[in-house]
Regions:
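Short, low-complexity N-terminal leaders and the immediately following helix N-cap/first helix
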Residues: 1-73
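Short, glycine/charged-enriched hinge/interface segments at domain edges or termini
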Residues: 2-6, 12, 62-155
């Protein structure tokens, strides 16, 4: 590399020279995601799914029906099962029943909120929820992180 300086040129001339030295892309090809790194997308790529896909727990705690808790604050709930990320609870949940639920676990349809463990008092297979819970409290909604049809790669 030479240490010699060239005389400055006008910006328009520099832009023209730069654009003239660039090869325009005139064709496209389909490649696997593994081979796409460092390439330019020919079109916007959109998500085909919502993430998360379902309602899921945002915290570790106990899944309950918020209306049932509101009707009887500090109610004693019977813990009838556990839901973990990748291992949903698939039993039937009745009145006065709760499940222990971990962050990322799919919410059962009978429950609409999660009480954080810090707001609960557990003894054996029962739990008292000491906090007031609104509907959808401590839950992630489908599409909260990534909405279906959202552009994930721009052209």
């Amino acid at each position: 590399m030479s240490n010699q300086r060239t005389a400055p040129i006008p910006i328009d001339q520099a832009r023209s020279q730069l654009l003239a030295s660039i090869d325009m892309i005139s064709t496209t090809e389909i490649v696997s995601l593994d081979d796409a790194c460092g390439r330019i997308a020919a079109e916007n790529i959109t998500s085909l799914i919502d993430l998360p896909r379902t309602y899921n727990a945002a915290v570790d705690g106990y899944g309950v029906d918020s209306a049932e808790l509101a009707a009887a604050p500090h109610k004693l709930f019977k813990i009838i099962g556990v839901a973990r990320a990748g291992h949903p609870f698939d039993g039937v949940i009745g009145v006065g029943e709760a499940i222990e639920i971990y962050t990322g676990a799919v919410m059962p349809s009978a429950h609409d909120s999660v009480a954080m463990k810090a707001d609960c008092s557990r003894t054996g297979d029962t739990v008292v929820i000491k906090a007031k819970l609104s509907k959808a409290r401590n839950m992630r909604q489908p599409g909260e992180n990534l909405d279906k049809r959202e552009i994930i790669i721009t052209k």
